[in-house]
Amino acid sequence: MSFSKLQLIEPILKAIKLCGYTTPTPIQEQAIPKALAGLDLIATAQTGTGKTAAFVMPALQRLSVPSTSTGRSKGPRVLVLTPTRELANQITEAVKTYGKFMRIRSGAILGGMPYFEQQRLLSQPVDLIVATPGRLMDHMERGQINFSRLELLVLDEADRMLDMGFSEAVDTIAAATPSTRQTMMFTATMDNTMARLAQRLLNNPVRIEIAGKKTTLEAIEQRLHTADDMQHKNRMLKHLISDSGMTRAIIFSGTKRNADQLANELHAQGHSAAALHGDMSQNARNRTIMNMKRGKIRLLVATDVAARGLDVTGITHVINYDLPKNAEDYVHRIGRTGRAGATGIAISFASSREVDSLRSIERYIGQSIPQQVITGLEPARPLRRSSSGSSPAPSSGKRWQGASAGKRYGQNAAPRSPFGSKTTRRSDTDGRFSRDEKKSVRQDGGKFGDFRKSRPSSPSRWS
């Protein structure tokens, strides 16, 4: 099917053609016609499936028709809620891309950016706003935004918004909008919590489910390396990044502190490397991502929160320096590579301290991650991957598609620094309900927008 068959207007089709796209993705093919028909919908789809365009294009088409509102409100006709600033920026860029040949007044309301700029945006007529819940609530409490003419509410990555503690904020924002609005909800998982949210906010929604697990995993070669300790991880990393085939890579660290230290170490060794985490100002994060896209950065050391929604083409490798505590985050991490028909390589380090996380991941994806050994860097001890000594049973797929996220193992354990024996505080961890995410929530509320300088690196331990 071509985009022209989706009944999109000519200005949008012209923008799509300019981007070089010819065929809609499955989520676009299913969601766009229903959205254009004005139906509420729930779409279960993973990142990298084209879901952003699936709601941006119908939103723009709605804005091509004059508003029927008779009031004098300057508020938006379309509101897109998303959990992180990175996702908000990505959606804002999509609006500009597909609305290139339309006269659309749009803007972003998110933490880490000056209040006065957002106040100026809200004081003028605006058609479409992309926002993070925390900062939007701040403006609502100040009486600076009116939703009386809102026609469309989009919840992007709704499951992640709830995970980050935005459930009450989402309900409050939705309650401030007209009950006659159209609502579209996009989520990676569909559990009971999400079902209850949909029941509260949506009206007789159409359900769309796009399979994503097998497609994602089949495009990515997964590898596992057993690590004796942090020094062993460093030596293996040094070997792996010397591969000329590693054009562009994201290295995931479990803490903000270690992301800074690791990036500094890599930079000192002559690599074009930088860190990306929640303590950085929005401008610093945008600058880092732009440098990555332009090829100025080869190795990006990131935490889960900062990399959520990161859309950079040409990522050949993902390296899990630290395994995520949550199995779902593993899939989101490795999904940064192997996109848009390309293949990718995902390499994970696992020490004896991370066995529980590894077991959870392998149960979630329904397979064992093939183990490899680097000659000369063999582990001193084998990794006991399963309590029974057998491979994990194949997954039925239900956990991926609908059940709640996997249990967090070792939640109260303080991870060790990769550059010494000193333990880091749990407040530095980047787990699913970590304080890093909670701080990101507060930053979106505008209370903690400062930028902390990267800590100096510890003496090198790579030899």
Language-model regions, residue ranges each:
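Arginine-glycine-biased low-complexity disordered regions
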Residues: 246, 268, 294, 312-314, ...
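Conserved helicase RecA-like core
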Residues: 2-383
